[in-house]
Amino acid sequence: MKIRVTADSTCDLSPELRASYGITLAPLTVMLGEDAFHDGVNVTPQDIIHAVENGKTCKTAAVNVYEYEELFRRVKEDCDAVIHLCIGKKFSACYDNACQAAKQCGNVYVVDSGNLSVGLGMMALDEVEMARAGKTPQEIVQALEAERDLIDTSFVLDQVDYLRNGGRCSGVAAVGAKLLHIKPCIEVEKGVMVVGKKYRGSFARCLEHYVKDKLEDRSQVDFSRVMLAYSPCEPGVAEQMLNYLGTVAEFKETLVCTAGSTICCHCGPNTLGIIFKRKTPKA
C-alpha cells in the first residue's frame, strides 16, 4: 500500500528534508498589512521582520477547507492513502478544516500533532519512516497519537514583542520582560504554549543555559534524533549553539532547520529551540 505524507507548513522542515522524505506541505496564510501570502511559497521570515520594522501588522490564518481538499485530491492521484499531520488544534483551525476536507476525499487520515514548528516536523519524519517500513495507515495514526506526548518542543525568545502583537503575551508581561532583560523559554505542553524557565543575560549565554537545562535529566532523553530550529539570528549564534549542543549530549542524528514565516510571525527574530523525544511523557 502506497502512503503519502502531507503536513502543515508550520513543520519548518528544510526543502532538502522534505524532498528526501517526500513530504508535501499545506501552506498557511501570512497577512502583512492587507496583503496575503503563503508560508514557504512567496514570503520569507526576513519579509516578516522587515514588514514589522516598518510598522505593518503581521497575522496568520489557517489553511481553509478548499485548499486542503485540493491538496489531498492532488496527492492522492499517485497513492492509496494520505496521512496529514496538522499543527496542534489548540493553536489553529487547521485541524478542523483538514478533517472536513478529508471527509470529501476518502482514505485521508488527519492527525493532530499537538505541536508546532519542528516538533511537528519530527513527527512527520517518523511518519514517513513508518510508512516506508510497511505500517498501515491505522497503525501509523495510532503511533503518532502516542508519540505526540513524547515530543519535547521548546524555544527561547530574545524578545516577546511578536508574541504580544499576536495576542499570546500581555503588554504588561512584554514590558516587564524587556525592562528586566528576560529571555523566556516557551514550551509546548499538552498542546498549548506555556512559559518555562526565564533567563537573563546575553542571548548566547541564555541559550547555553537553556540547552543544558533541557538535557539535564538524561535518563528521560531519547538520543536517536535532535532538531535545532531558529529564526533569523545574529551572525554565528546558531552555529555556536550547534557546537555547544554537541558538547552537552551526543545524539545519533542532529538536524538543523530554520523557522518558517508562520512561526516567525509569532516569535520574531533571535529565537532558537531544540526539539527531541522523551522516553516517557512529561509528568
Placement of each model-derived feature along the sequence:
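Mixed-charge interfacial surface used for oligomerization/domain docking
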Residues: 4, 10-24, 29-31, 35, ...
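Short active-site oxyanion
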Residues: 1-5, 80
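Class I S-adenosyl-L-methionine
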Residues: 36-104
